[in-house]
UniProtKB/Swiss-Prot annotation:
Gene it is expressed from: ctaB
Protein's name according to its UniProt entry: Protoheme IX farnesyltransferase
NCBIfam families named among the record's database cross-references: cyoE_ctaB, PRK04375.1-2
Family: Belongs to the UbiA prenyltransferase family. Protoheme IX farnesyltransferase subfamily.
GO BP: heme O biosynthetic process
Matches recorded under Gene3D superfamilies: UbiA prenyltransferase
Length: 318
């Protein structure tokens, strides 16, 4: 890896927004949403319910855990964040929040989140939350991200735990249905993030982060986006077979899955990520990236609506 150098940031007063941004709020929203969907699905499938106050505390614990992992990630990645234009305005490289303060915040929030989850639910949910924080903050951030082009594939497990945590908080166990929700996020992560990496591959190359377009080229990345999309679609339909997903979920997963596949095929045929790629091809990659976020929200939104609103009518399962 080449030596990283960046200008020392000029200290500026930190604002509340800086501390919120340190927790990666956009990621936190998706994490919390999928956890709530897992919680609702567990209740709907088993008939077990949590006291509303305990459920709210469990969701808060997930949010704090996500924020903790984000702060630890920003602490460790401050050196490369300062060099990449996409991340140079983050709280640490911009000089608003000292690195040590970000780490302290992340560690304290980690402990508080796990303790709250344990008090509100059970040891299994707390242990899964602790592991997911460790997975993202240490395994992915400190090891995989700068070590292998499979960083997103293996590291994607960190972001796939929230629905499992939500399920465990309700029932104290993690059956097949919980792991199906895990698998949906796990296989969604590579095509989602690689679409972004096609746009930012020069930035990653500049800081020697071995994202797939940097190590294997844009063409190979475009192909892998299609491969993982082809895996994701049947995985996303698995809830229909177990009874976890009903007619609403099936319509959403089937319809949006076809759109996702269309984007993947279009990206494969494009020059997105190549040097001198047409602006339209790069716009396609960005649109696919944004659509993938909508796709995941819609899938888990369908799970949430079916089980929380009494609209769960299984297609095949009991």
């Amino acid at each position: 890896m080449t030596e990283l150098t960046a200008a020392t940031p000029t200290k500026r007063p930190a604002t509340a927004t800086d501390y919120v941004n340190l927790m990666k709020p956009r990621i936190m929203m998706l994490v919390v949403f999928t956890a709530v969907a897992g919680l609702a699905a567990a209740s709907g499938m088993t008939g077990i319910t949590m006291h509303p106050a305990m459920a709210a505390i469990a969701v808060l614990a997930v949010a704090l855990g996500s924020g903790a992992a984000g702060a630890i990630n920003m602490w460790y990645d401050a050196d490369i964040d300062a060099i990449m234009s996409r991340t140079s305005t983050r709280p640490i490289p911009s000089g608003a929040v000292p690195k040590e303060e970000a780490l302290t915040m992340g560690l304290i929030m980690s402990g508080v989140s796990v303790m709250l989850m344990w008090l509100a639910s059970n040891w299994l949910a707390a242990a899964l939350l602790a592991f997911s924080i460790f997975y993202y903050g240490v395994i992915y951030t400190m090891w995989l991200k700068r070590a292998t082009p499979q960083n997103i594939v293996i590291g994607g497990g960190a972001g796939a735990f929230p629905p499992v945590i939500g399920w465990a908080a309700v029932t104290g166990n993690t059956p097949l249905d919980a792991w199906i929700l895990f698998a949906i996020i796990f296989f969604w992560t590579p095509p989602h993030f690689w679409a972004l990496s096609l746009l930012a591959h020069k930035e990653y190359a500049k800081v020697s982060v071995p994202m797939l377009p940097v190590t294997h080229g844009a063409k190979a990345t475009r192909f892998q986006i299609l491969v993982y999309t082809l895996v994701l679609i049947p995985v996303s339909l698995a809830p229909l077979a177990t009874g976890l997903g009903g007619w609403i979920y099936g319509a959403v997963a089937g319809g949006l899955g076809l759109v996702f596949l269309a984007y993947a095929v279009a990206i494969l045929r494009s020059k997105a990520g190549d040097d001198g790629a047409p602006a339209g091809d790069m716009k396609l990659a960005r649109t696919a990236f944004l659509f993938s976020i909508l796709y995941l929200f819609a899938l888990f939104g369908a799970v949430l609506v079916e089980h929380a609103a009494g609209l769960h009518f299984p297609v095949f399962g009991a």
